[in-house]
Amino acid sequence: MAAPSVSCGAAVPYRLFLAGRVSFAREQGLWKAAASGLQTGTRCQILRLKHSPAVTTTKNVAALRRESYTVDFIKKQIEEFNIGKRHLANMMGEDPETFTQEDVDRAITYLFPSGLFEKRARPIMKHPEEIFPKQRAVQWGEDGRPFHFLFYTGKQSYYSLMHEAYGKVLHAEERQDQLRAKGLFSEKSKSKDLIGSRWLIKEELEEMLVEKLSDQDYAQFIRLLERLSALPCDAAEEEFVGRFRRTVTVQSKKHLIEPLQYDEQGMAFSTGQGKRKTANAEAVVYGHGSGKIEINGVDYLLYFPVTQDREQLMFPFHFLDRLGKHDVTCTVSGGGRSSQAGAIRLAMSRALCSFITEDEVEWMRQAGLLTTDPRVRERKKPGQEGARRKFTWKKR
């Protein structure tokens, strides 16, 4: 049987062209031939050339590790801040060794007075750690592999913390089951006392973890901590929960309550000052009386003809159920009738604090009786009829 014939006129030139292409590609190291050669037959069969991409053996680790603010950058900024603070202290005639941040702020306000309403737009000179945000250090090695197994979750610190908290929950539940099996478990020791403290808010937790969290993530974490705090905890678990609690100071304790004073007749009295808008008031509240109130030597019914102003004066006594038990003498100046009534009410409320308990003082603070009203009259705007009112627009 005769061998199959091959048309050399067409096959040879193409074979030479392909051989040259394969040999050139082998030199470049980019192409590989999957067979030893070309097959001859009725039709020339050409094997497909496979492309294998070149693998980069050296990685630009510096580019992968690029940080917004490096450690060297922060150190340089701190050095410049310390030098600038010493120069500022010398300019103000102060001792550079005892020049505090409060002195720096006061000096900047004096040297660079600004009338800008937005405080963030005013000139400042703060420590670099307060100016530049915290950032996470590099989380992978020279080979490009991350150190933490939760790196690819995008929130490795958050999920690691959730794992740790849930592990403590399981440990506390196991200990609770053991106590219940021995008959030593009591409901009184079930929960941890959290009075006087609060959980970290979302922004504080983000600053601690140096990660952005969603509201759902934050709520889930707080629910897990509340579940842990409801279980009988040992010292280590209480310390873990305490890391995410902040002590809340009772606001009423910040107010300085003056002790009671006594006059020549031995009657107890207390004084208080109040202010609202441009009105200033001073009140003297006596311990025993019939409910008589004098303002600048005039009875309050004659001084304030408007019922609303009278109700403002009587509200502190009505709130404490002390109507008709105290006599009050007030002096007030400046402002209008409404602002004078507010200033007198604040002065009387502060004076009453000397006659009541700490709990009642806290109730008054929560009711707003011990808080100064910061509202003032809004200034007129140029090009307008008033603070908000515009001129009447006329087409013609």
From Swiss-Prot:
Any one Pfam family match given in the protein's UniProt record, by short name = Ribosomal_S9
Note down the stretches annotated as region Disordered: 374-396
GO cellular component terms, alphabetically, are: mitochondrial inner membrane; mitochondrial small ribosomal subunit
Show the PROSITE patterns listed in the entry.
Answer: RIBOSOMAL_S9
* Span of the signal peptide: none
User: Would you say which domain of life the source belongs to?
Assistant: Eukaryota
> Could you tell me where this protein is found in the cell?
Mitochondrion
Subunit structure, as described in the record: Component of the mitochondrial ribosome small subunit (28S) which comprises a 12S rRNA and about 30 distinct proteins.
> Can you tell me which family this protein belongs to?
Belongs to the universal ribosomal protein uS9 family.
This one is known as Small ribosomal subunit protein uS9m
Question: What organism, scientifically named, is this protein from?
Answer: Bos taurus
